[in-house]
């Protein structure tokens, strides 16, 4: 048996933590006088880095902006971090784990933090729907493949 066949896949959460939090209500208290019919915008971003052999940090950045017309009611940003031990996988499987599986684990923590911050700002409760990070990751891979295809066509 080769050494590669002996390597078992292993996944463990070492730590989940809040890396950064920001909440702004730039138009308070005037915004509280208006009818609450906001336009809510959700932005997501993930980043990962290798900390040691088989140890990775994944950071999920969630930004929620609620606007009433042209005015920002609130802007809330949370960077939810996690340290994960991941062994026995590489390539596309590792990229999927770091880009979809780990963010799926982190999102409920970020969502709870955002809900709490919005509530502390005395705004109506904000319920963020679950996010399909697997679909987002597949879209990312497709965009990468299309980008490489375009580069190859330009080189030809």
Swiss-Prot record:
Residue span of the signal peptide, if any? none
Q: Which Gene3D superfamilies match?
A: SecB-like (3.10.420.10)
Q: Where in the cell is it found?
A: Cytoplasm
Gene Ontology cellular-component terms for this entry are: cytoplasm
The alphabetized UniProt keywords are: Chaperone, Cytoplasm, Protein transport, Translocation, Transport
Q: Name one GO molecular function term.
A: unfolded protein binding
Main localisation: cytoplasm
Q: Which cysteines are joined by disulfide bonds?
A: none
Task: Read off the InterPro entries from this record.
Answer: SecB, SecB-like_sf
Query: GO biological process annotations for this chain's record?
Result: protein folding; protein tetramerization; protein transport
- What is annotated about its quaternary structure and interactions? Homotetramer, a dimer of dimers. One homotetramer interacts with 1 SecA dimer.
What family, per the record? Answer: Belongs to the SecB family.
What's its job?
Answer: One of the proteins required for the normal export of preproteins out of the cell cytoplasm. It is a molecular chaperone that binds to a subset of precursor proteins, maintaining them in a translocation-competent state. It also specifically binds to its receptor SecA.
Record-linked PANTHER family:
PROTEIN-EXPORT PROTEIN SECB (PTHR36918:SF1), PTHR36918
Q: What is this protein called?
A: Protein-export protein SecB
């Amino acid at each position: 048996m080769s050494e590669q066949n002996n390597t078992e896949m292993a996944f463990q959460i070492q730590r989940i933590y809040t890396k950064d939090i920001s909440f702004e209500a730039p138009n308070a208290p005037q915004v509280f006088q208006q009818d609450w019919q906001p336009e809510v915008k959700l932005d997501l971003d993930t980043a990962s880095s290798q900390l040691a052999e088989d140890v990775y940090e994944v950071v999920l950045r969630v930004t929620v902006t609620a606007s009433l017309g042209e005015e920002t009611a609130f802007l809330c940003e949370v960077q939810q971090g996690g340290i994960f031990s991941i062994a026995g996988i590489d390539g596309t499987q590792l990229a999927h784990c770091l880009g979809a599986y780990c963010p799926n684990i982190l999102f409920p923590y970020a969502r709870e933090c955002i809900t709490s911050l919005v509530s502390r700002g005395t705004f109506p409760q904000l319920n963020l729907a679950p996010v399909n990070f697997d679909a987002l990751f597949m879209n990312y891979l497709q965009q990468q493949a299309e980008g490489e295809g375009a580069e190859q066509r330009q080189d030809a």
